[in-house]
């Protein structure tokens, strides 16, 4: 039985990375440094732009985050692909929250737009995931649109984020 809370702490997210939150067969979040959120502040089965589910999560920004030291030297900026990965992470986390089992894998995205950046001077990144569809057959898959905001300003959008849960990834 999944503990379906509306919010999750950093410790909860770390437990997910160890396979402790959604059980041995549930999807896992990555461990640090690839875990791209510090907390989930809202999860619902309704709501969002399509009224089919909504997730909102946050990442606290500080100049000591690992990527600022290497991307780029003298011009530090959070890689856009990490924001995209965070959105995929949240789609998979939501599938586990719904009770889905399997190993989460990103399956694609329809379109991504970057209209801003995350600099070391920022305070907080907010991720918003709006679910469009959940497929619950042999393959469990989530389809969603996502937004990334920095200090309240929209900087990335992604349409048709796709994540699947697989029982066996050996042929993937």
Swiss-Prot record:
It is found in: Cytoplasm. One of its GO terms (molecular function) is (3R)-hydroxyacyl-[acyl-carrier-protein] dehydratase activity. Pathway: Lipid metabolism; fatty acid biosynthesis. NCBIfam families: fabA, PRK05174.1. PANTHER family: 3-HYDROXYACYL-[ACYL-CARRIER-PROTEIN] DEHYDRATASE, 3-HYDROXYDECANOYL-[ACYL-CARRIER-PROTEIN] DEHYDRATASE. Necessary for the introduction of cis unsaturation into fatty acids. Catalyzes the dehydration of (3R)-3-hydroxydecanoyl-ACP to E-(2)-decenoyl-ACP and then its isomerization to Z-(3)-decenoyl-ACP. Can catalyze the dehydratase reaction for beta-hydroxyacyl-ACPs with saturated chain lengths up to 16:0, being most active on intermediate chain length. This is 3-hydroxydecanoyl-[acyl-carrier-protein] dehydratase. It comes from Citrobacter koseri (strain ATCC BAA-895 / CDC 4225-83 / SGSC4696).
């Amino acid at each position: 039985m999944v503990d379906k809370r509306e919010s999750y702490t950093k410790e909860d997210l770390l437990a997910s990375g160890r396979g402790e939150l959604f059980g041995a067969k549930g999807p896992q979040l990555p461990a640090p440094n690839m875990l791209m959120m510090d907390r989930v502040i809202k999860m619902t089965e309704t709501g969002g732009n399509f009224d089919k589910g909504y997730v909102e999560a946050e990442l606290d920004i500080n100049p000591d985050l690992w990527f600022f030291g290497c991307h780029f030297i003298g011009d530090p900026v959070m890689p856009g692909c990490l924001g995209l990965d965070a959105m995929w992470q949240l789609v998979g986390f939501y599938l586990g929250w719904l009770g889905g089992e399997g190993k989460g894998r990103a399956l694609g995205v329809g379109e991504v737009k970057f209209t801003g950046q995350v600099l070391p001077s920022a305070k907080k990144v907010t991720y918003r995931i709006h679910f469009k569809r959940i497929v619950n057959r042999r393959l469990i898959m989530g389809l969603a649109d996502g937004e990334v905001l920095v200090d309240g300003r929209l900087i990335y959008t992604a349409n048709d984020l796709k994540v699947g849960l697989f029982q066996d990834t050996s042929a993937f």
